Amino acid sequence: MKKWRRSVLWLILSVCILVSGACSMKSPQQAASKANNQEIEYASNSPTMKGVTIDGARGFMWEVKNNGTTVYLVGSIHLTDDNFYPLHSKYEKVFAEADYLGLEIDFTKAPDEEQQKRIVDMMMYKDGTTLKDHVSKETYAKVKEFLMKNGLEANAYDAFKPWQVEGNISVMSLKADYNLEEGIDLYFLQKALERKIPVIGLETQESQMGALAGFSKERQEKSLNTTLDDYNSGVINDPTDELIEMWKKGDEQTLLKITNSLYSDPEYGKAMLTDRNIGMAEKIEGYLNTNKEDEYFIVVGLSIILCKLF
């Protein structure tokens, strides 16, 4: 069975802030309605991008309606390549009529001073210690080796906690021709700013970082080692090209295999996918219960939508 580099899967499919499984194929409609055991009308003509198209990247999109409110839920990947756009025209048509854009994080609102302090505290050591004091000699040596191979000072990451070091390494290990600034979420954010429609966040920077920082020091070091070993081994498949092609083609079989692989570590799967899915679903349920004839265009990490709820 193919083994994908897990840290890159997290970066592309589920987490949008690292730049600074048995998977249930339940529909997003079911995920949203499950929160309060409420019945929601599933549109029979849900515009999931299937079949052959010649009109741009297909991707994955679902529609759910309740009492006049419509939510379009787009499964996003957080980076693209130079040939990713245009998207299928259905996305542009639906977005042009949307009243709100929903994202994992509302990037138009900066954290306030207190939030910024808490975020920095989650990322960095503030007690006079450094990474070297919190991981084994072997792990620290691997980090130094990685940094020097990439032209950085051996102590460049000393101030960062293990989870942030892992994120930095994941970003640095991506090929130069991938575009972290042109993911689907940021693409539609720019369009929302141009249209001057409200942008809403289903999470915050603090809550998303909290999910990553919430693991024990030992778990963070184990995950950091996995990322370093994957990078150094040369035998682990870099999934980035395959993920991008999967999205372009709307390849559900590859999507299922990749999302399943994220649950190879159940603790990570629960914290990074299942728990976040439930929180987002509750917010989406609130939008569907406004009894207003509004349309919401919501773009979140694809693996969060298609995750195991139980």
Segments from the language model and where they lie:
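A cross-kingdom marker for long, charged
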Residues: P266-F310
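Structured, acidic catalytic/metal-binding patches in enzyme active sites
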Residues: A35-G51, F60-A271
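Alpha-helical scaffolding within the catalytic cores
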Residues: G56-F60, M280-E282
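Bacterial N-terminal signal peptides that target proteins for export
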Residues: K2-L11
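C-terminal motif of bacterial Sec signal peptides marking the signal peptidase cleavage site
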Residues: V19-A22
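Bacterial signal peptide processing site
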Residues: S24-K26
